[in-house]
């Protein structure tokens, strides 16, 4: 009767965040680099920003579902359907690659431009994913809560 764990891309953000926190603590504790550039990137973008994005990807769908459910709507997408998992994965990999490029730009200065563009693309994807969830919420609120035509 043991169920397999359900895959959740938002947990990747949490894992990246906690890994980055540990790595940044090691960098800080042992003063591994003469500059604090890598420490700043790993802590700010790897830990804080990844944590924030992972939380937002959980909060927006839950609040959308909760508010619609409390208003009496019957035909609702599940919490996992408010933001398509495949777009969360794409965003995660672009975000991760941008962090890697920021770190590599410490050693090769010209990579800072690629890192910045990737980070910008990552944020645009994040905005689009959140906006799509809001659009689904608005589309559902324009219907009648007691509309049971989908159950015929």
Label for each model-derived stretch:
Residues 1-152:
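Hydrophobic alpha-helical transmembrane segments of multi-pass integral membrane proteins
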């Amino acid at each position: 009767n043991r169920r397999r764990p359900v895959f959740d891309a938002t947990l990747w953000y949490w894992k990246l965040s906690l890994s980055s926190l540990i790595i940044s603590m090691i960098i800080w504790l042992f003063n591994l680099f003469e500059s604090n550039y890598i420490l700043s990137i790993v802590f700010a973008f790897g830990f804080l920003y990844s944590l924030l994005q992972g939380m937002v990807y959980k909060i927006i769908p839950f609040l959308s579902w909760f508010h619609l459910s409390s208003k009496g709507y019957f035909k609702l997408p599940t919490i996992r359907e408010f933001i398509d998992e495949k777009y969360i994965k794409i965003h995660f990999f672009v975000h991760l690659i941008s962090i890697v490029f920021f770190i590599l730009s410490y050693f090769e200065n010209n990579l800072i431009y690629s890192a910045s563009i990737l980070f910008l693309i990552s944020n645009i994807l994040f905005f689009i994913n959140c906006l799509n969830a809001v659009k689904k919420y608005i589309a559902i609120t324009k219907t009648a809560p007691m509309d049971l035509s989908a159950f015929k």
